[in-house]
Amino acid sequence: MLQTEMKVIQQTEIADKVYELILTGERVADMSPGQFLMLKPSRSDLLMRRPISICSYDKTAKTCILLYRIEGDGTRDFSKLSEGDTIDVLGPLGKGFDIDQTPAPKTALLIGGGIGVPPMYQLGKELAGKGVQVTFVNGFQSAKDSFYEKEMNAYGTVHIATVDGSLGTQGFVTDITNNFPEEPDVIYSCGPKAMLQAVKASFPETKTYLSLEERMACGIGACYACVCPKADDAKKQFKVCEDGPVFRADEVSL
């Protein structure tokens, strides 16, 4: 059973309503880039778990970092956790990013939007460790919403786009990527559906992997709450939590 208790090491608000939650537990040993955890709120009236992507992990220290934004009662409940508290966790879950491709890529473009930025961090770290030249492009609404630029700079070049122009390039992530002189060997992206659609349309010939953000209820493929149409047959569907959340761009219809 993937259900376990994890202990809170530290929690900090790092951007507007965005929290960095550091946990420790035995399940860290099983984590890979692009997976997620289903966290159970402590309030008895909040029955459903909430999916939170894994930002990073240290298997030696048995710690992992989750970044999440307060969106409702569940995530607001998580924001009250402090050092020494425990939380009921299901996971790690899902199929993450393919980082052992053949032939190995020389360059990788990692595109994250909003709360889709966190899983790009561990992915970029591991790709850089394999000798891949990593470029991060992160999109936010405003400077107050941005995070992890310094941390990502340790593993690659970081570009920032904000809708209001308060940090980096004004506009969207594609306003940056469309001006790159060369296409990368591989693209990985996570963020809102509109952003993923734009990324897919901008790089039709490049091997691209998309991590889908969908509302989930069970996290294990039992409830069919997070389905996505297949590209080759719209009548058939993937279960994002079980078959994904990461898919090749040509597999899914967005």
UniProtKB/Swiss-Prot annotation:
Binds 1 [2Fe-2S] cluster per subunit. Binds 1 FAD per subunit. Keywords: 2Fe-2S, Electron transport, FAD, Flavoprotein, Iron, Iron-sulfur, Metal-binding, Pyrimidine biosynthesis, Transport. Transmembrane segments: none annotated. InterPro entries: Cyt_c3_hydrogenase_gsu, Dihydroorotate_DH_ele_sf, Dihydroorotate_DH_Fe-S-bd, Dihydroorotate_DHASE_ETsu, FAD-bd_FR_type, FNR_nucleotide-bd, OxRdtase_FAD/NAD-bd, PyrK_electron_transfer. FAD binds at R50, P51, I52, S53, L67, Y68, R69, G74, T75. GO terms for biological process: 'de novo' UMP biosynthetic process. Responsible for channeling the electrons from the oxidation of dihydroorotate from the FMN redox center in the PyrD type B subunit to the ultimate electron acceptor NAD(+). Belongs to the PyrK family. Heterotetramer of 2 PyrK and 2 PyrD type B subunits. This is Dihydroorotate dehydrogenase B (NAD(+)), electron transfer subunit. It comes from Listeria monocytogenes serotype 4b (strain CLIP80459).
